[in-house]
């Protein structure tokens, strides 16, 4: 179910990159909580929280959270993979990505470090979702559980949101 939800989120986002903003209502039970101002979110299952930059949106859909910029040009999908360990999730990352992104070309071979006291691995590249060319990056964090954050946008769009993205990424912290 998570893979179907992620695929649908990516398909809707790929369409929005070409056609403009898309709105979807959350479906299913959520492991997400928000504050009254809707800018602070937590993914309880993963054990992470984050603060949205002004104008950004978060759409919980069951165990998946899709975060997007105000113009929907950049999207980030958070989910807990089936793998129970950080190392297993990193090892199986290609298989996970290939279920949604086609013609994957990795342009960043990957780096390992820590992010806000969590083990962190990141990589990136290009590919296609439903025939639409995208640039993608993926981050794996070891929080309460392993969480994968897939970020994607049309080529050249990510740079437009670089400052906001840095602010957002620095706000991702472990809870619980």
Residue ranges with predicted function:
Residues 15-25:
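C-terminal segment of classical bacterial N-terminal signal peptides
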Residues 1-12, 17:
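Bacterial N-terminal signal peptides that target proteins for export
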Residues 28-61:
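N-terminal "mature-domain start" segment
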Residues 50, 54, 91, 95, ...:
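Solvent-exposed, polar/charged alpha-helical surfaces in well-ordered, non-transmembrane soluble domains
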Residues 148-176:
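Surface-exposed amphipathic alpha-helical segments
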